[in-house]
């Protein structure tokens, strides 16, 4: 699902809201979540999951084109951990499809 598909679905389910309003709300939520993560904050949405940062230690990598070794610096990467309700819902719907 893309951001524009999400906006369309929400606008259809909430006909009292204009597409512009829904688009602004979705953009604002994503912007605020990105800002919070970039400040090192954890985001928890009960029933859905949590977003946090995971540390990746420096390591030696390899350029796939040239084969030369490259030193990769340490970094933080965003990480999503699904909540129990989301995991259960996904597993139940996938099992029903088999």
Curated annotation (Swiss-Prot):
Domain of life: Bacteria
Keyword list, A-Z: DNA recombination, DNA-binding, Transcription, Transcription regulation, Translation regulation
GO cellular component: chromosome; cytosol
PROSITE patterns: HISTONE_LIKE
GO BP terms, alphabetized: DNA recombination; regulation of DNA-templated transcription; regulation of translation
InterPro entries in UniProt: Hist_DNA-bd, Histone-like_DNA-bd_CS, IHF-like_DNA-bd_dom_sf, IHF_beta
Subunit structure and binding partners: Heterodimer of an alpha and a beta chain.
Stated name of the protein: Integration host factor subunit beta
Species this chain originates from: Hahella chejuensis (strain KCTC 2396)
The encoding gene: ihfB
């Amino acid at each position: 699902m893309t951001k524009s598909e999400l906006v369309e679905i929400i606008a259809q389910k909430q006909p009292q809201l204009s597409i512009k309003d829904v688009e602004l709300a979705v953009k604002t939520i994503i912007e605020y979540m990105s800002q919070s993560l970039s400040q090192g904050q954890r985001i928890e949405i009960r029933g859905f999951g949590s977003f946090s940062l995971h540390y990746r230690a420096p390591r030696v990598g390899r350029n796939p084109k040239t084969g030369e070794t490259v030193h990769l610096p340490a970094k933080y990467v965003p990480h999503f951990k699904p909540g129990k309700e989301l995991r259960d819902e996904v597993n139940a719907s996938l099992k029903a499809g088999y």
